[in-house]
């Protein structure tokens, strides 16, 4: 079976009405438009998403009237920065922009993959950070300035 669109998010499904099969992906796999997966039940599925469709933690695909395939994301260690004020946020954004690393900003925190060079720079600039095990809902991404409009 090949899925071409995300039918729902698991949070919007009455899970008591369905038998749930899950597949755990890396956050990088969420960027893929075409992927073959194997569920926790050993069933193989293809995902070839239509334009505009994106995978995320909790994406759900209806297999039939009684079965749903749900995408989960494995946890990973990430650098987590919680800037103490707007000045530190600006400095941190400038530093990270120069590294060209994909990031996620959520709830006033900056998330990015563990990188010894980034850690060294943050330490040198006295920017506090932690390494935390995190499950991302969406993949880390580069800032897309081409989408900027006025």
Swiss-Prot record:
One of its GO terms (cellular component) is cytoplasm. It is found in: Cytoplasm. CDD domains: UreE (cd00571). Disulfide bonds: none annotated. Pfam families: UreE_C, UreE_N. GO terms for biological process: protein folding; protein-containing complex assembly; urea metabolic process. Keywords: Chaperone, Cytoplasm, Nickel, Nickel insertion. InterPro entries: UreE (IPR012406), UreE_C_dom (IPR007864), UreE_N (IPR004029), UreE_N_sf (IPR036118). GO terms for molecular function: nickel cation binding; unfolded protein binding. Its main location: cytoplasm. Belongs to the UreE family. Involved in urease metallocenter assembly. Binds nickel. Probably functions as a nickel donor during metallocenter assembly. This is Urease accessory protein UreE. The lineage of its organism: Bacteria, Bacillati, Bacillota, Bacilli, Lactobacillales.
């Amino acid at each position: 079976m090949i899925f071409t669109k995300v039918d729902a998010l698991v949070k919007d499904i009455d899970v008591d009405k369905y038998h749930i099969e899950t597949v755990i992906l890396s956050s990088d796999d969420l960027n893929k438009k075409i992927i073959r997966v194997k569920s926790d039940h050993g069933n193989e599925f293809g995902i070839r998403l239509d334009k505009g469709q994106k995978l995320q933690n909790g994406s759900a695909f209806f297999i039939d009237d009684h079965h749903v395939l749900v995408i989960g994301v494995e946890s990973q260690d990430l650098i987590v920065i919680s800037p103490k004020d707007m000045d530190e946020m600006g400095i941190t954004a400038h530093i990270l922009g120069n590294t060209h690393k994909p990031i996620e900003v959520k709830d006033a925190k900056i998330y990015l993959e563990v990188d010894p060079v980034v850690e060294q720079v943050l330490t040198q600039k006295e920017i506090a950070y932690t390494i935390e095990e995190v499950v991302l809902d969406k993949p880390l991404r580069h800032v897309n300035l081409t989408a900027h409009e006025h």
